């Protein structure tokens, strides 16, 4: 796949890429990638450490390409304020904004989980309980001693004490571990509860490794979640989380999201016609609607009145990155404006 930044000369690069795809054929696809913050990264100390032999333009290109491969691992390398996160971000107290954005980044990293044997220091420092120093120590320990093969080995990392381990352990995955629970988001403190749950449902850890516990949720519900939670010594929400993790050990929650929209041909503003159905990616959510990338180098606007249901704020139904179906309402070529709707014009 080819990643094209949405900044300077993006349109010309896209046309050149489409011509290349026509000539080469095969499975080659391209995607327009939001390059906000790529220039900030390319001029940073971190980029200079990662690519000392490259100039800033090549560093930006690498950052854009990596955003297509693994956006989370790449975006953690820049200050979230540099991404352009909202309508009034510069009107807010910058310290409060920074705290709020850092909290969101941390939540995202923790929700996905981190492979302790491949993660960069930039990604590790965003895990609860870790900071820049302990993240660097963890990577240095990994380079000196080889891959981690058990979660408890993380305790051997210099300056990473029991308290920090307690906070970070559930978010660090160890795929190389022979113990299947180390592959999951189950915290070491809940390992005993997970084993009690499996025993009560007539399953084993070997069954988890082999993917033979498809009916675990149904068995647990038959036994009664509250009674089972009491037997395992945890609350019902924790028990539910354990079941979810055991059913898909090592899963990446992002796998359940719609895949990015990859294209082979370029679309012009003049190609758009009212009523046309398109797939688009939400680029920004604002008070009066949402801007959606539909592949024509000009984001279209879905006004709040054209969302699928009545809401006080568009963020109740849409988030940046959502892949949605929209219909063209009107196109103003002179002013470069596109009106879109999420309400199917064919359904009455």
Where are these regions (language model features)?
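Flexible helix-coil linker/hinge segments at domain or subdomain boundaries
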Residues: 1, 73-74, 336
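Duplex nucleic acid-engaging cores and interfaces of nucleic-acid transaction enzymes
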Residues: 1-53, 61
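A glycine-rich phosphate-binding loop feature that marks nucleotide/adenosyl-phosphate handling sites
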Residues: 7-9, 32-40, 81-94, 156-162, ...
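A cross-taxa feature marking solvent-exposed loop/turn segments within ectodomains of secreted
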Residues: 10, 147, 333-335
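Non-cysteine beta-strand/loop elements that form the S-adenosyl-L-methionine
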Residues: 33-34, 117, 293
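Long, highly charged, low-complexity intrinsically disordered interaction regions
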Residues: 49-147, 153, 162-198, 236-264, ...
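Single-stranded RNA-binding regions, centering on S1/OB-family and related RNA-binding modules
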Residues: 172-348
């Amino acid at each position: 796949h080819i990643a094209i930044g949405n900044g300077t000369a993006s349109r010309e690069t896209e046309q050149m890429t489409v011509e290349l795809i026509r000539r080469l054929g095969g499975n080659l696809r391209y995607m327009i990638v939001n390059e906000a913050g790529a220039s900030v990264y390319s001029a940073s100390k971190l980029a200079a450490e990662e690519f000392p032999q490259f100039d800033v333009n090549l560093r930006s290109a690498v950052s854009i390409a990596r955003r297509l491969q693994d956006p989370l691992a790449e975006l953690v390398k820049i200050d979230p304020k540099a991404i352009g996160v909202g309508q009034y971000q510069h009107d807010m107290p910058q310290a409060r904004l920074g705290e709020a954005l850092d909290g969101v980044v941390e939540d995202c990293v923790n929700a996905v989980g981190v492979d302790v044997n491949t993660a960069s220091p930039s990604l590790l420092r965003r895990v609860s309980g870790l900071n820049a120093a302990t993240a660097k120590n963890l990577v240095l320990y990994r380079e000196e001693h080889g891959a981690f093969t058990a979660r408890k080995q993380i305790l051997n990392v210099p300056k990473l004490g029991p308290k920090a381990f307690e906070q970070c352990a559930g978010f660090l995955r160890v795929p190389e571990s022979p113990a299947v629970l180390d592959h999951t988001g189950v915290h070491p403190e809940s390992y005993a509860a997970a084993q009690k749950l499996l025993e009560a449902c007539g399953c084993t850890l070997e069954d988890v490794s082999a993917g033979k516990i498809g009916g675990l949720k149904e068995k647990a519900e038959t036994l009664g979640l509250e009674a089972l939670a009491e037997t395992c010594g945890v609350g019902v929400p924790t028990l539910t989380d354990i079941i979810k993790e055991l059913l898909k050990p090592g899963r990446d929650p992002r796998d359940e999201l719609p895949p990015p929209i990859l294209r082979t041909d370029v679309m012009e503003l003049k190609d758009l016609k009212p009523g046309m159905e398109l797939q688009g990616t939400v680029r920004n959510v604002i008070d009066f609607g949402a801007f959606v990338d539909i592949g024509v180098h000009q984001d279209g606007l879905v006004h709040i009145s054209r969302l699928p249901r009545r809401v006080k704020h568009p963020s109740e139904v849409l988030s940046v990155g959502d892949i949605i179906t929209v219909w063209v309402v009107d196109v103003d070529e002179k002013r470069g404006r596109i009106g879109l709707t999420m309400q199917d014009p064919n359904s009455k």
